[in-house]
A protein has these predicted regions:
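Structured, active/binding-site neighborhoods that engage oxygen-rich ligands
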Residues: 1-203
Length: 203
């Protein structure tokens, strides 16, 4: 779905209206979802993919944040980045927490690629989205469990980035928490890549 969202955003261009973005994202996600129906989607999303007239279903799941990374790269202001992230979430995850998770993730990516420090990213996310980023990974590990909500995935993924030394370390941090590790890893790595760059060995 990350590819589907990125492809849709590039197709409509940087000045597209919110409605145009939402329509393109919904079309592309359905297209990719139907082509790859066994990719481990959640139950409601699987049904959404098949709908002739898909509607948002109030989800606050972490899928909205997992797929949003392109929004953090394609726009020249954090306000536009957040507007587009909100639009990509709204086609399915129109619960306030689902939208917030997508906006926070895209904002962190935008700031990371534009040279903000970890402290600046942390302060912005805490102020704008009211996530508690003061916790440590060591503390989180003592109680963390498998959970798929934005509000219990996105802050932890950002903390995994904040405590990291490089891209690979960020992913190791995320996976070390357990729980929904593929989503944690995807969110954390999307921020880490913007901050550290792509490791040379992967280029």
């Amino acid at each position: 779905m990350t590819i589907a969202v990125g492809e849709a955003l590039m197709a409509v261009g940087p000045k597209a209206a919110v409605k145009e973005i939402e329509e393109a994202v919904a079309f592309n996600m359905q297209d990719w979802g139907r082509r790859y129906p066994h990719a481990g989607y959640g139950g409601r999303f699987r049904h959404w993919i098949k709908e002739n007239n898909p509607k948002p279903y109030g989800s606050y799941g972490n899928g909205s944040a997992m797929r949003v990374s392109a929004a953090g790269w394609l726009y020249d202001s954090i306000e536009r980045t957040r507007e587009v992230a909100r639009a990509t979430a709204n086609v399915t995850h129109n619960h306030p927490e689902g939208i917030k998770g997508a906006e926070a993730t895209a904002s962190a990516i935008y700031m990371a690629r534009n040279g903000s420090s970890k402290e600046e990213i942390k302060e912005y996310i805490e102020r704008e989205f009211h996530y508690d980023l003061s916790r440590t990974l060591d503390n989180i590990r003592t109680y963390y469990h498998h959970v798929e909500s934005c509000q219990e995935t996105v802050p932890e993924a950002i903390i995994a980035f904040l405590e990291s030394k490089d891209c690979d370390d960020a992913v190791r941090n995320a996976v070390s928490l357990g729980g929904d590790t593929d989503t944690l890893g995807a969110i954390t790595r999307s921020i880490a890549e913007a901050f550290y760059g792509i490791p040379a060995v992967l280029i």
